[in-house]
A protein has these predicted regions:
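Intramembrane alpha-helical segments
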Residues: 16-95
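A cytosolic-side transmembrane-helix exit/cap motif
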Residues: 3-6, 68-77, 93-100, 119-126
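Multi-pass membrane catalytic core of lipid/isoprenoid biosynthesis enzymes
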Residues: 3-51, 130-168
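Hydrophobic alpha-helical transmembrane segments and immediately flanking/interface helices
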Residues: 51-52, 59-65, 164-181
């Protein structure tokens, strides 16, 4: 979707350098998406429907939202966070409450880190027309949003430990996961 921008920002990569032709990339991507959809529906109807949603988020991010500042910074983390929901659907065919905590924590953390990664070359982004969150709302506010989201992610991650009996309801595996993070 952004071959012209990649040619400026990352000319050494396979697509902008023409080591990988656009038609071949489209074929590989299409086959990958089809295989993911088939695999998702083979696992369960709910998992298959979620794969459709994830494919839509992926395409929306790459085609439109990547250049829309905060919307790109929100859409990508939502898709990444939904992978935990996908895992629960595949394993249990339902989404336990703790998985929603994980989803929110992952999405918030990735939101904060996604904003942080957009600081690396603001001038180049401005030149090629990519509207990143720092360019949209300013560097200072973007730093505050990033730090707040990252901090909130850790707070959400430990909520089940605070609100439920530590080992009985939250589970030792969840407590270990939060401890590792």
């Amino acid at each position: 979707f952004h071959r012209h921008q990649d040619a400026i920002a990352n000319p050494h990569r396979p697509i902008p350098s023409n080591r990988l032709p656009a038609k071949q990339v489209l074929t590989i991507a299409s086959v990958s998406y089809i295989l993911c959809l088939i695999a998702g529906f083979l696992m369960s109807l709910k998992a298959g429907l979620l794969v459709i949603g994830l494919v839509i988020i992926s395409h929306a991010y790459n085609a439109i939202l990547k250049e829309r500042g905060i919307w790109g910074s929100i859409s990508l983390p939502v898709g990444i966070g939904l992978l935990s929901v996908f895992g629960a659907l595949v394993v249990a065919d339902r989404v336990p409450v703790k998985v929603w905590y994980v989803f929110v924590a992952i999405a918030l953390y990735d939101f904060g880190t996604h904003i942080t990664t957009t600081f690396k070359d603001l001038e180049r982004d401005r030149e090629v027309g990519i509207l990143t969150t720092p360019l949209q709302i300013g560097v200072g506010p973007a730093l505050i949003v990033s730090a707040t989201a990252t901090t909130a992610a850790f707070m959400v991650a430990i909520l089940p430990v605070w609100t439920e009996d530590l080992l009985a309801d939250a589970g030792w595996h969840y407590v270990c996961w939060v401890g590792i993070v």
